């Protein structure tokens, strides 16, 4: 499933094309994806102008000029493809056009095609004033890319928790958008074991420890590095221009079971365990 860097990469690719343009046509080719499309989906979008394209957690948010927000989630295999006027572009390899489920025609002549072989993605229309309180968003945690994510916040969120640190970091009600790949990578860079209790990031009086400060900085750094690399293309992820991400070539631990730990002087071996149903990759020697 695309994680925050992949969704943010898609947002940055779509924004220059979508923002300021209007939907002249919307071709909805099936009744549902993961969930049914909203009633009169195409009719409610046609003629509307996109005023901004944002992101909340792993959701893309297109602000429309009628105070509605088009909420889009990529699911497991969703992707957007941009076809500019005059292009003879075809679906990327492995992306059969039969899986092109929504085609947005823009006032600029550009088409944006949503492709989703597994159909776990979905789209909703929500009134802007209702967005924060909507069930999709009302329990979503803080954004990890902003200044809000700092050691003091991690200490406050995790104080007293005996939950394993990696499991706590994946709790979307605490921190939004973090996924398995980038949590594994951040914990290795921070030298912290995924099995240590999350509460150890706070001192006895709830104050942030050095670990909390270090981890918050590294989480932001890993996410920003991944975004600059276009995300990680393991199965389905492509950028809006069809290019692959390449952060997967920088993985230190994720999917590298039995390989030597890349930390200089460590000499350990990357291990794989299962936590809360998810594979965790780490080095038991240098991650404490």
Swiss-Prot record:
Keyword Heme: no
Molecular-function GO term, any one: damaged DNA binding
InterPro entries: DNA_glyclase/AP_lyase_DNA-bd, DNA_glyclase_Znf_dom_DNA_BS, Formamido-pyr_DNA_Glyclase, FPG_cat, MutM-like_N-ter, Ribosomal_uS13-like_H2TH, Znf_DNA_glyclase/AP_lyase, Znf_FPG/IleRS
Residue spans, zinc finger FPG-type: 252-288
Keyword Zinc (UniProt): yes
Co-factor binding details: Binds 1 zinc ion per subunit.
Needed cofactors: Zn(2+)
Documented EC number(s): 3.2.2.23, 4.2.99.18
Residues the record marks as active site: 2 (schiff-base intermediate with dna), 3 (proton donor), 58 (proton donor), 278 (proton donor)
SMART domains reported for this sequence: Fapy_DNA_glyco (SM00898), H2TH (SM01232)
Keywords: DNA damage, DNA repair, DNA-binding, Glycosidase, Hydrolase, Lyase, Metal-binding, Multifunctional enzyme, Zinc, Zinc-finger
Example of a GO biological process term: base-excision repair
UniProt catalytic activity: Hydrolysis of DNA containing ring-opened 7-methylguanine residues, releasing 2,6-diamino-4-hydroxy-5-(N-methyl)formamidopyrimidine; 2'-deoxyribonucleotide-(2'-deoxyribose 5'-phosphate)-2'-deoxyribonucleotide-DNA = a 3'-end 2'-deoxyribonucleotide-(2,3-dehydro-2,3-deoxyribose 5'-phosphate)-DNA + a 5'-end 5'-phospho-2'-deoxyribonucleoside-DNA + H(+)
Binding annotation for DNA: 99, 118, 161
Pfam families per record: Fapy_DNA_glyco (PF01149), H2TH (PF06831), zf-FPG_IleRS (PF06827)
Signal sequence bounds: none
Protein purpose: Involved in base excision repair of DNA damaged by oxidation or by mutagenic agents. Acts as a DNA glycosylase that recognizes and removes damaged bases. Has a preference for oxidized purines, such as 7,8-dihydro-8-oxoguanine (8-oxoG). Has AP (apurinic/apyrimidinic) lyase activity and introduces nicks in the DNA strand. Cleaves the DNA backbone by beta-delta elimination to generate a single-strand break at the site of the removed base with both 3'- and 5'-phosphates.
Quaternary structure annotation from Swiss-Prot or TrEMBL: Monomer.
Family: Belongs to the FPG family.
HAMAP family: Fapy_DNA_glycosyl (MF_00103)
Protein name from the UniProt record: Formamidopyrimidine-DNA glycosylase
Organism annotation: Beijerinckia indica subsp. indica (strain ATCC 9039 / DSM 1715 / NCIMB 8712)
Protein encoded by which gene: mutM
